[in-house]
Every structure is written in C-alpha cells, then in structure tokens.
Amino acid sequence: MNIKYIILGLLLFVVASATAKYTCECNFSHGETRLIAVKDKSHCMERCNSIIQEVYTIPCDLQTCTCKCTNGTIFGCQPTPTTTSTTSASTTTGKASSSGPSTTGRASSSGPSTTGRASSSGPSTTGRASSSGPSSTGKASSSGPSSTGKASSSGPSSTGKTSSSSTQTSGSQTSGSQTSGSQTSGSQSGQQTGSQSGSQSGQQTSSQSGSQSGQQSGSQSGTQTSGQTSGQTGAQTGQSTASSGSSGSSGSSGSSGSSGGSSGSGGSSGSGGGSGSGSGMAVKVDKCYGTYCPCNKELLSVRVL
C-alpha cells in the first residue's frame, strides 16, 4: 500500500515538474516591472533582455517641447504645423493654332518678260526683299506673269531671304536657284556686291540696269532717292515702304529675253491666350502637442519568483 502511494507521488512529481513554470520579475529603470513565466530559470535573463528592445513612450513637456528619458536621453517634440488653405485657380493655356496653305512660302516662277524693268510693291521690315504671299520663314515668293519686262511682287518677308526659281542666261531666264552671297549670271541672290543687269538682289551697292535693290537706304516710290551709289538705267516703279532704310522688292527681269515671275503663297496664323486667377490663404500654427517621445528601456534587475 505504501509502495502504491510512493509510486503515485513520483508520477505526480514528474508530471508537475514537466508542466511547472517559473515566474520572473523584470525591473526597468523607468519604473516598469514586468512578470514573465518561463519553464527554466535560466531563461529569465534572456526574456528580460528581450523586453529592453521594446520602446516606451513618455509625454512631452509642453513648455520646453522636449522629452527626457530616464536614461538621460532627451528627445524633442517637433511642432506640428497646421495649415488651412483654400485655393481656387482657373487657367487656360493658349496653344497656337496655325492655318494657311504654306508656312515656308517657297517660290515657283512663270511668265515671260521682254524688257528688264523691275517693279516692287509691299513692305519690307528689315530691308530684305520680299515677294508675294506672307512668308513666315523669309522665303519670298512672287506672283503673276510679267508682260513688258516688269516683274511684280508683293508681300512681306520676315527674314529677308529671297528665293527665285530662275537663272538668267544671255537675256533669257531659265530654271535655277538662289544662293546666299553669290550671283549666277543674272539670277537673284540674297547678298551681293556687283553690278546687275535685269536682276534683283537682296543687298547690293553698285549700278543697276533694270533691276531693283533689296536693301538700300531710303525709300523707293518710282525713283530711288538715297543710299544708292550709282545710277539706275531701268525705271524703278515699285511702291515699297522700307523701315530701317530699306525697301522690299522681288521679281527678276531679263534683257531681251524672257524671265519668269515666281508665284507662291504661304501663310500661317496662330493665336494663343492664357489667363489664370487664384486666390489662397494659409494659416500656419505651430503648436507643441502632448504627444509622446520614444525612449529606450534599461534593465535594472531580474528576480525569479
């Protein structure tokens, strides 16, 4: 009978030992005490040290807006901006729209001419020759056949480059091209110095016979008034208003031959507008709220209960 009680007691002890748990007390510097249950006493320190990794918070000091942890660490409570703003704005961005048959107004030539007189019409803004139709890139075009050797042209040119699709050879104008700064046998050039006979130049200082100067100081209305260094034998009957001392001209003529007036048109138009209005007000208030600062725990002692 006693043996049975002994065996039963041993069994209960084994079961109790297997299921037994120890209680550990962890004390921290900030005053926190935590009780944890472990199966082995040696686990108390390990478990308490794991709690150190946890962060605790303390409220901010509203006067200094700082927090001082128990281990001496000081955290600042940053002011939280409160912004109230109302903004209304409407804006339209003007995108330019273009219309027109051509924006680069390149010239094509047609029509005979028998006597080399050049007439011009139309304004030229910078003294560079212009021809028919608005040209946005300064390429000139002229229009209309020329019957008595008078080449007619009209239209503004913004950059003063003139284009001609004809080259005059021995008094007859055939196909050719204009090159800037050089003249090929009675053709039209953008800038040249020399004499011309029955041709048009964008810029010249020399005598002309039946030709018109694209850039000359003064204005031309039938005759040339000033800025020309030599006489002209061909009558200039152009109507051209020149700003900055230059006149616009286009068209070329051939002496005892045929020259083609060039025709071409180009135009572009664009419009754009933008408007925007906005009103807003913002109020910024800096306050130190009673939030909490994070602090690190510091373990003081561990005890097994």
Swiss-Prot record:
Signal peptide: 1-20
Record's GO cellular component terms: extracellular region
Lineage of source species: Eukaryota, Amoebozoa, Evosea, Eumycetozoa, Dictyostelia
Keyword hit for Endoplasmic reticulum: no
Biased composition (Low complexity): 80-256
Compositional bias of kind Gly residues: 257-279
List of glycosylated residues: 27, 71
Key words, A-Z: Glycoprotein, Secreted, Signal
Listed name of the protein: Uncharacterized protein DDB_G0284671
Subcellular location as annotated: Secreted
Annotated stretches, region: Disordered: 80-281
